[in-house]
Design a protein with these regions (language model features):
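Intrinsically disordered, low-complexity and often Lys/Arg-enriched segments
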Residues: 1-4, 97-99
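A short, Lys/Arg-rich alpha-helix, primarily the initiator
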Residues: 2-26, 73
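Alpha-helical structural signal
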Residues: 17, 42-43, 68
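The alpha-helix within a helix-turn-helix
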Residues: 21, 32, 61
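Short alpha-helical DNA-recognition segment
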Residues: 25-44
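The DNA-recognition helices of helix-turn-helix-type DNA-binding domains
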Residues: 38, 49, 64, 75-78
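Short, basic-rich loop-to-helix N-cap that marks the start of a DNA-contacting helix
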Residues: 49-62
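Short, charged recognition helix plus adjacent turn
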Residues: 72-99
């Protein structure tokens, strides 16, 4: 198992692959067929090239028996981590405050 640096966020596709698919011996193709979505959709998620949408979260929830919110929280955490790495955020200054 890889050591994860502090503050690093794992893409939800990596969690899907290592914690759900691999233990069950599921391929991306098989999972896609079972979820009634395209194989590239699942493959791109597993490769970290695509985000988990609400629709995908609902399908994964129904299939694996966990909540859709679980998947969306993983995606949201990853998205915030990526956004926080954006150097241009430091140039944003506070605007007018409500009186």
């Amino acid at each position: 198992m890889k050591k994860i640096p502090f503050g690093y966020s794992i893409h939800p596709g990596e969690i899907l692959k290592t914690e759900f698919m691999e233990p069950l011996g599921l391929s991306s193709y098989r999972l896609a067929k079972d979820l009634h979505v395209s194989a590239p959709r699942v493959n791109d998620i597993v490769l970290g090239k695509r985000s988990i949408t609400a629709d995908t979260a609902m399908r994964l929830s129904a299939y694996f028996g966990c909540s859709a919110q679980f998947w969306l929280n993983l995606q949201n955490k990853h998205d915030i981590w990526l956004a926080a790495k954006d150097k241009s955020l430091s140039r944003v200054k506070p605007g007018a405050q409500a009186a």
